[in-house]
Amino acid sequence: NLVIRKKTRIFATYILILIDMEKKRIIEAMHNRLHEIDPHAKAILFGSRARGTEHEGSDWDVLILLDKPKVTLQDYDKYSYPLRELGWDIDEIINPVLFSQKEWEENHYTLFNHNVNKEGIAI
């Protein structure tokens, strides 16, 4: 009985390691895709994936901060579409949210800004 419990713990640890490796692989893929588009853009993972409270089917919320005065419609095509396409390729849902650095700093008082700054993970 002790041997079975020990093997079960080892297997559970192995599964957690595999999940963590998969999460790192996806974060790295998002980082690489964004870097191909704009090496100077900053990205922050937020939401349940950043907090570690995700469940099967949770999406990947990513804040993208651009070094420009204002985000344009063309920026959504340039930045959002390639990340969403990556999600389709790896069977995940990636939800990019775009802000210019200036707009992000001007909205520092919002709950969204507070939560991202508190729990976000730079990718």
What do these predicted regions represent?
Residues 3-42, 50-56, 67-123:
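Catalytic core of pol beta-like nucleotidyltransferases
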Residues 61-65:
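Short, aliphatic-rich beta-strand segments
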